Structures are given as C-alpha cells and as structure tokens.
Amino acid sequence: GSSHLLGSPQIGTDKNLFKEDFIMSRNLKELIRQMTLEEKAGLCSGADFWNTMGIERLGIPSVMMTDGPHGLRKQEGAADHLGLNKSVNAVCFPAACATASSFDVELMERMGQILGDECQAENVSMLLGPAVNIKRSPLCGRNFEYMSEDPYLTGKMASAYIRGVQSKGIGTSMKHFAANNQETDRMQISSE
C-alpha cells in the first residue's frame, strides 16, 4: 500500500483527475480540522531553514526542500541560510540566463529531470526553482538567475523545467515571480 496521505504524487497523470482532486481536497480539509493551532502555525514556519515541521500524531512527515534554480544546493549537517556549511556535491548547470538563451525546451526539461533525480538521491521533496522574475533592469544583481526579459520565453522554459522535475515526483516552487529587481535596500524596502 501507499504511504502517501494525500494521494499519488503523480496525480496529474490519472484519468480520474477531478475525482482524485475532490478526494484529496476532502482529505486535506479533514486533516486540517484535526490540527491544533500550534501545529498549523508550525507548518507555516518550519522546523529549520530547509525542512517543514512534521506532525507525527497525524502522520505528516517533515519535508525537505532546497534551493535549485540551476543545481541542488543542499548543505551537510545543520542548515543555515547563509550557506556557511559544506554543500553536498551536485551537478551545477549553467545559470538560467544561459540555459534560456538556448531556446531549447527539451533540453530544459531534461535538465529538470536530472535535478529531480538528484533530489530523489538526496531525499529532497521540493526544489525551490525555477526563478522566473522578468528582467526589467540591468542593475538587478540576480539577473543571472532569471531566464529572460521576455515573458513568453520565460514561461516556455520554466514550464519545461517544472515538467522535468515533477516527472520525478519532486515538487517545484517558482520563485521571485515579480518585482525582485531592486538592489538598493532590497532587504528592507517598505511596501507602504
């Protein structure tokens, strides 16, 4: 039997997609009803920088995620947000600005598959990528991490990357979706 609480990670390939989605939605609502306020809050903050909090009494495992727009960045030992601990050896692909310049969606999907394989090997459930911010300023210090100033190209390449990673049963998280172009005061800007 399957140990998945919420259904198959490959649910999108099932012919009964809408029925499965309904069952999953019902199961999620029931699961959330059983959680305490502290448990719900704990899922929002995580166990540490790279792991969600598990809830053993409900069978909810801790989930590991790691950075990965162009390669798995998983640290050995205790994780820290500064990346001061030694990283696990992994493939490092060219940055997104270079891979997107290939205009090769099949190559990007293959890259995603390889990243998915590495996630499986390192017990990572979610890869934090791709980075899809649309380049608006040449002064953005993270432009190397973004695919293009063209939303069509970014969408096509990001979709291929996601398909590849998810084909291995690994979740993805598009990041820096919008408005991540500012360098001056980037860590303390007010939204007022």
Segments and roles (model prediction):
Residues 1-2, 7-23:
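Short, Lys/Arg-enriched N-terminal segments with co-localized hydrophobic residues
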